[in-house]
Design a protein with these regions (language model features):
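Catalytic histidine neighborhood in serine/cysteine hydrolases
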Residues: 211, 215-233
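Catalytic nucleophile-loop/oxyanion-hole region of alpha/beta-hydrolase
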Residues: 38-74, 240-245
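Short beta-strand/loop motif that positions the catalytic acidic residue
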Residues: 190, 196-198, 202
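Catalytic active-site module of serine/aspartate enzymes centered on a nucleophile-bearing elbow/loop
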Residues: 228-288
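A short loop-to-beta-strand scaffold at the N-terminal edge of the catalytic core in hydrolase folds
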Residues: 1-9
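Short, surface-exposed "cap/lid" segments of acyl-processing enzymes
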Residues: 9-38, 42
């Protein structure tokens, strides 16, 4: 199995590391990776056999980068949109104290009722999942039309060979439904600092559950912003003016977190150095 990864590095020393988790059917185009069956990674396009395995792939890749010598002292942030938001929450659940903060854009804490089939259909399709898991027969509206507000962006997504546009495969839909139900039941376990953004007119993931996440999470540092009139894809599918608002809020939040986080790190390093003393021979000794 080959998984496509990419990174963007600034010319100057970065304040911290940001890891991006893309949404269902999308690709990575900072540090990022395409999930199995997505973008430029290998595997059946649009097929998620095991969501836990997908999260483990991300965890191992991101953790490996964080633990490199040149990155070991840098702040670590994860950012995810839609299904990527669910990946972010599960990465946090895997290692609750590892990440310094998260940015969640319309996270998949619950699939909106407008997209989800009725319970009778779900029960029937769940049984079929064991027999024909890769079949594309889930009766859902066109997600591209629901997610992206701008017609030009919809065309761009439809024209990309790396973005999956077909109906959800049975096993994929089952995995997404199962994971979203699990996350919805365990919102109170979220403990890291986070910025949570959601469009008020989102028809793909439920804005009311994002509000519930903000209320239930035990995080002492949490911010929720609901953008009236905006759709599901906040990072790519909105008007230029709306996209500017969203990324301005993200940049402001990151600047605040890196400023306080790096100041704390400097104090810790200074405290450690204060305990060291150089003797007459030039050797550094620890002062008890």
């Amino acid at each position: 199995m080959k998984l496509f990864t990419c990174r963007w590095l600034p010319s100057s020393e970065p304040k911290g590391l940001i890891f991006l988790c893309h949404g269902y059917g999308m690709e990575c185009s900072i540090f990022m990776k395409d999930y199995e069956g997505h973008g430029k990674s290998s595997g059946l396009q649009g097929y998620i056999k095991d969501f836990d395995a997908l999260v483990t792939d991300c965890s191992e890749h991101f953790t490996g980068i964080c633990e490199r010598k040149e990155n070991s002292k840098k702040l670590r942030f994860i950012m995810g949109e839609s299904m990527g938001g669910a990946v972010v929450l599960l990465l946090h659940r895997k290692k609750p104290a590892f990440w310094d903060g998260a940015i969640l854009l319309a996270p998949m804490c619950k699939i909106a009722d407008d997209v989800k089939p009725n319970q009778f259909v779900i029960s029937a399709l769940t049984k079929l999942t064991r027999i024909i898991p890769t079949w594309k027969i889930i009766p859902t509206p066109d997600i591209v039309d629901l997610a992206f507000r701008e017609p030009a962006v919809r065309k761009e997504v439809r024209d990309s060979p790396y973005c999956y546009k077909g109906r959800p495969r049975l096993q994929t839909a089952y995995q997404l439904l199962t994971i979203s139900l699990d996350i919805e039941k365990r919102l109170q376990e979220v403990s890291l600092p986070f910025l949570l953004l959601h469009g008020g007119d989102d028809k793909v993931t439920d804005p009311s559950v994002s509000k519930l996440l903000h209320e239930k999470a035990i995080s002492s540092d949490k911010t929720f912003k609901l953008y009236p009139g905006m759709w599901h894809s906040l990072s790519r599918g909105e008007t230029a003016e709306n996209t500017e608002i969203v990324f301005s809020d993200i940049t402001k939040w990151l600047d605040e977190k890196t400023a306080t986080g790096n100041a704390k790190l400097e104090r810790e390093l200074k405290s450690g150095n204060d305990a060291l003393h150089t003797d007459s021979s030039g050797k550094t000794i620890l002062v008890e």
